[in-house]
From Swiss-Prot:
Organism: Cupriavidus pinatubonensis (strain JMP 134 / LMG 1197)
Protein name: Tetraacyldisaccharide 4'-kinase
NCBIfam families: lpxK (TIGR00682)
An example Gene Ontology CC term for this record: plasma membrane
Enzyme class: transferase
Taxonomic lineage: Bacteria, Pseudomonadati, Pseudomonadota, Betaproteobacteria, Burkholderiales
Catalyzed reactions: a lipid A disaccharide + ATP = a lipid IVA + ADP + H(+)
Family according to the record: Belongs to the LpxK family.
Chain residue ranges for the region called Disordered: 343-366
């Protein structure tokens, strides 16, 4: 993304956090977008449009807002939890930023430029089958041919992909929540905050679940030991970089979340926010004064899969461990285990209509 486009994106993102002149100027278009979103969901729910039912439970992790909220680490954590429960999960994702002519399996040795950065990170971290293709229903069916043992599907960032029916929907937010609460383009919402869902997951270390909102859960990302990009066997605690001249760079949906976690570990980094899914085709550190002056450059795991060609011993990767409220993990396990026996005996079917079921009333994330 060029600098002017990046600046425009930053401007719009900032406007989405308030109800200023920009929001009111865009409001007529926002009302139209909201109407289209509601009609589209209603159409799939009531069988106006064709959708596909898979012979297994489908769990969707997505968001009603534009931008990253931590879906990838959530999918990794859920895949690991389902595996520990004795299930055999598979993951289907779009493959953002890559051109695909047919469904493609993501292997730990794949290139991010071929399959996308987030699917590659999931494949490496979760050790489960991961496939990518914009048509998630076709992608899932293709995956089942190659991996017939898969008995539960995780759909990464597929909340609005209604062509694939689902059994359990998780709507994610981060500390920005729903912004100004308005639909695109006046605000960040793809769908209303009141949209029904089975659970709300908030990626914010300061969030605490309460009995008053029983289906709203929290997630935090704990920093692990950093490892050197050129030599992953070299590892040290992030706190070991305190007192050093540090540049932190992040090409994720909310770079400030990464920077804040480093400050919480005792670092005082210079920061380099990059566009989400930045491809690193151009070296952002070359000629950057803060990078030239830095003793250490810290990047995210998501960015690391695109930086493997860089030969710079100053670059260290900061992995995170997602920690999700146990209540949500237990709820998903129960829901999936209750459906797996039926799923095993049910033949695959394409072309069914309607969503699998009505979800319970959603919790407004405000």
């Amino acid at each position: 993304m060029s600098a002017p486009r990046h600046d425009l994106a930053d401007f719009v993102t900032a406007q989405w956090q308030r109800r200023g002149w920009f929001a009111w100027l865009m409001l007529p278009f926002s009302l139209l977008f909201g109407l289209i979103a509601r009609v589209r969901r209603y159409g799939y729910l009531h069988g106006w449009f064709k959708s596909t039912r898979l012979p297994m439970p489908v769990i969707v992790v997505g968001n009603v807002t534009v931008g990253g909220t931590g879906k990838t680490p959530a999918v990794i954590a859920l895949a690991q939890a389902l595996t520990e429960a004795g299930l055999r999960p598979g993951v289907v994702s779009r493959g953002y930023g890559v051109t695909l002519k047919h469904p493609r399996r993501v292997k730990p040795t794949s290139k991010a430029s071929d399959v996308g950065d987030e699917p590659l990170l999931i494949a490496r971290a979760a050790d489960v089958p991961v496939w990518v293709f914009p048509d998630r229903a076709l992608c899932a069916q293709t995956m089942l041919v190659s991996h017939p043992g898969v008995n539960v599907l995780l759909l990464d960032d597929g909340l609005q992909h209604y062509r694939l029916q689902r059994d359990f929907e998780i709507v994610m937010f981060d500390s920005r929540m729903g912004g100004n609460g308005l639909m695109l383009p006046a605000g960040p919402l793809r769908e209303p905050l009141s949209r029904p869902r089975d659970a709300t997951l908030i990626n914010d270390p300061n969030f605490r679940a309460t009995p008053e909102r029983p289906d709203v859960y929290g997630m935090r990302l704990d920093l692990d030991e950093a490892w050197q990009l050129n030599d992953p066997t070299m590892a040290r605690p992030v706190s070991a970089f305190a007192g050093r001249r540090v540049l932190a760079a992040a090409g994720i949906g909310n770079p400030e979340r990464f920077f804040a976690s480093l400050r919480g570990a005792g670092l005082s980094p210079k920061t380099l926010p990059l566009p989400d899914h930045y491809d690193f085709a151009e070296d952002p550190f070359a000629g950057n004064p803060d990078a030239l002056d830095a003793d250490v450059i810290l990047i995210t795991e998501k960015d690391a899969v695109k930086c493997e060609r860089f030969d710079d011993p100053r670059i260290w990767v900061v992995p995170t461990t997602p920690v999700i409220d146990a209540g949500l993990i237990d709820k998903i396990r129960r829901a999936v285990l209750a459906r797996v026996p039926a799923a095993k005996s049910t033949p695959a079917s394409g072309g069914a209509t309607g969503l699998n079921k009505e979800h319970q009333d959603g919790q407004p994330a405000a």
